[in-house]
Amino acid sequence: ITVGVKDTGVKSGIIGEIGNFWPTNETSRKILRASAHASVETGAAISIHPGGHPDALLQHLNDLIEAGADPARIIMGHLDVFPYSPEVVKEIAETGATLEFDRFGSENTNFAEGGHDIAFPSDVQRIERIEQLIEWGYESQIVVAQDVCLKTDLVSHGGGGYIHILDSIIPRMRKRGFSTENIDNILIENPKRILTFT
């Protein structure tokens, strides 16, 4: 973050994605504490991959906050992957953390976590959750992404690819009544805020 990658001049702009599991263990908690210390020292935001249980979200946040991290510098990712209730996501929002919905385009995907099959929500369900959060007053904390991380996420292999949000999701949001301001905040202003070092 401060030195860069060898002599390239390229520096990391974010701490993470910090992977976590549930139940958490002392090694994971130590990594979270180190991430918090690095964020305080550098001003970089922290991106969290939470464990797949509702209790994991607040546990990870509490570990970071207790170690000194500013909740406004924490991005809680994959809020649209695991079956978190609206109430749990609202609890995260109330801390001031950024809410990341990052698996747009993965509607027909499922995987196993902790011995349970998890079916991802549809893009419509993701949009509905974001709409609900905006109604609750959390628009300034929402970011979206596609987390293109599997071959099947690529257009050449049947996925939505890197353009899915702009080509498919934004038009759907507009049809549902999202304003230009809503969309600009989610796509531009909120990422700009969280990615700017403090």
List each model region and its residues.
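Active-site beta-loop-alpha junctions enriched in small/polar residues
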Residues: N20, G51-H53, G77-F82, F104-S106, ...
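Distinct, well-ordered alpha-helical segments
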Residues: E26-R29, H53-G68, S85-A93
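Short acidic/histidine-rich active-site segments
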Residues: S47, F101-R103, Y138-G159, I183
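Active-site gating/metal-coordination segments in enzymes
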Residues: I1-E41, T95-T98, G105, G115-H116
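Short helix-capping segments at alpha-helix termini
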Residues: E66-A72, W136-Y138, K175-S179
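Structural preference for beta-strand elements that scaffold enzyme active sites
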Residues: S12-I14, A45-S47, R73-I75, G96-E100, ...
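Mid-to-C-terminal alpha-helical segments outside catalytic/metal-binding sites
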Residues: H164-T198
